Design a protein with these regions (language model features):
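Short acidic-aromatic low-complexity motifs
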Residues: 2-30, 130
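Hydrophobic beta-strand positions in extracellular immunoglobulin-like domains
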Residues: 85-87, 106
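Short beta-strand edge/turn micro-motifs at domain boundaries
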Residues: 102-125
Length: 131
């Protein structure tokens, strides 16, 4: 099931980048998303409605958004991804190039929790590993 979980995470990331609403089928109804401490909003979003609100919030802040997954740690029911994000701030016009790290928790092939971290080491530790 582990590799399947990695594939689910990649499909969610790819679907989000395409703006594909079918991506919600891979996300549990009771999902919790916790923004990383490096992001200005610092919010926690709940359920499909929350995920959709996060997309709206994100698109209000950023344009020309690009994301590349740099590394993936397959941890069974958890997956850690290290991403490179590039975008332009809509209000500031400033081009941003930053690394983010996400810890994804899956149950029955769906994402139930997605939490952002400031560093890869912090996410791996939260997943029960030390880097």
């Amino acid at each position: 099931m582990s590799q399947e979980n990695v594939e689910v995470v990649r499909a969610v990331i790819d679907g989000w980048l395409r703006g594909d609403p079918a991506t919600l089928e891979l996300i549990s109804d009771d999902v919790v998303y916790v923004s990383p401490p490096t992001m200005p909003d610092g919010k926690t979003y709940h359920g499909h409605e929350g995920v959709l609100q996060w997309v709206v919030d994100w698109r209000q802040e950023w344009t020309d958004y690009e994301l590349d997954v740099l590394r993936v740690h397959d941890l069974g029911d958890r997956v850690v991804t290290v991403e490179r994000n590039r975008a332009t701030g809509k209000r500031s016009g400033v081009w941003v190039d930053m690394q983010t790290v996400s810890l994804w928790t899956l149950r029955d092939g769906k994402i139930v929790r997605w939490q952002g971290y400031a560093s890869e080491a912090e996410a791996l530790e939260a997943a029960g590993l030390r880097k």
